[in-house]
Amino acid sequence: MAATSQVLTAIARRLEGKVALITGGASGIGETTAKLFSQHGAKVAIADVQDELGHSVVEAIGTSNSTYIHCDVTNEDGVKNAVDNTVSTYGKLDIMFSNAGISDPNRPRIIDNEKADFERVFSVNVTGVFLCMKHAARVMIPARSGNIISTASLSSTMGGGSSHAYCGSKHAVLGLTRNLAVELGQFGIRVNCLSPFGLPTALGKKFSGIKNEEEFENVINFAGNLKGPKFNVEDVANAALYLASDEAKYVSGHNLFIDGGFSVCNSVIKVFQYPDS
C-alpha cells in the first residue's frame, strides 16, 4: 500500500527531475509558481532583486530544492550569471520562467507621460525578457530541449487597460515569444507566454491604486466575464505548470490567457441578456 502511494505521488509530480529558473520569483506570481514547481518535483532557482524576500521563499521551499540568486534582469551580466549559476548548481536548465516585470505611474494622457518612465518599463519588461530568452537559449540549444515561458498580460493583445508603456511592453513580449518559438522549434525548445487578468499582487495594487486586497478582488470579480470562481495567483501558477510540463509537449508560440474569457468580450454590444433572477 505504501509503495503504491509512493508511485502515485511520483506520477502526480509533473516536473520530476526538472530544473527551473524563475525571475521575479521572490513575490507574487513568481513566488507562488516557484513553490508549485517545487511541489511537482522541480529544483528551482529564484532570481530577483528583493533579496530578503527571495531568501524567505528558499527557506519556505527548502534549501535542498531551491536557491536564490540576486539578479537585475536589465543587466546582461546578471542574467548570464543567473543562468550559469543554475546550471552549475543543478547541472542543467529545463525551464526559464521570465516573470519579472514592472509598471509606470498610471497617467491616462500620453502628453503627461515621462520618457524616463517609459524607458524604465521597457528595460525591465522587454529587454529583461529578451536577455532571459537569449541566455536560456544559450544553454538549451546544445541540449536540444527546453522550455521558455514569459509573463505577458491581457495588455499583450488589447488596448485601454493599462499605461502606454506597460501595454507596449507586453505587446513586445508576445512578439518576442512568437518569433523565438519559430527560431527554437528546430531544437525542440518550446516558447510560450501567459496573459493573466488583474491580480492583487504588489504590481496590480500599485497600478490600480487599490491597496485593499478584498476590494481589489471585488472590482475584478465585478468586471470579469466568468462569474462564480474567484481569480487568484494560484490560477496563473497552475497555467505556468501546465506550459512547463510534458502535458504541453506540443504547445509552442502560444499566448495562454487566464482571464475567464474577458479578452473575447465586447462590453458595448451585449447580445446575451438574461432577466434578473
UniProtKB/Swiss-Prot annotation:
Binding site for NAD(+): 24-29, 48, 73, 99, 170
Residue numbers annotated as active site: 166 (proton donor/acceptor)
InterPro entries: NAD(P)-bd_dom_sf, Sc_DH/Rdtase_CS, SDR_fam
Domain of life of the organism encoding this protein: Eukaryota
GO molecular function: secoisolariciresinol dehydrogenase activity
Pfam families: adh_short_C2
EC number: 1.1.1.331
An example Gene Ontology biological process: lignan biosynthetic process
Alphabetically ordered keywords of this record: NAD, Oxidoreductase
Record's subunit section: Homotetramer.
Family: Belongs to the short-chain dehydrogenases/reductases (SDR) family.
Role, per record: Oxidoreductase involved in lignan biosynthesis. Catalyzes the stereospecific conversion of (-)-secoisolariciresinol to (-)-matairesinol via a lactol intermediate.
Name used for this protein in its record: Secoisolariciresinol dehydrogenase
Species, as recorded: Forsythia intermedia
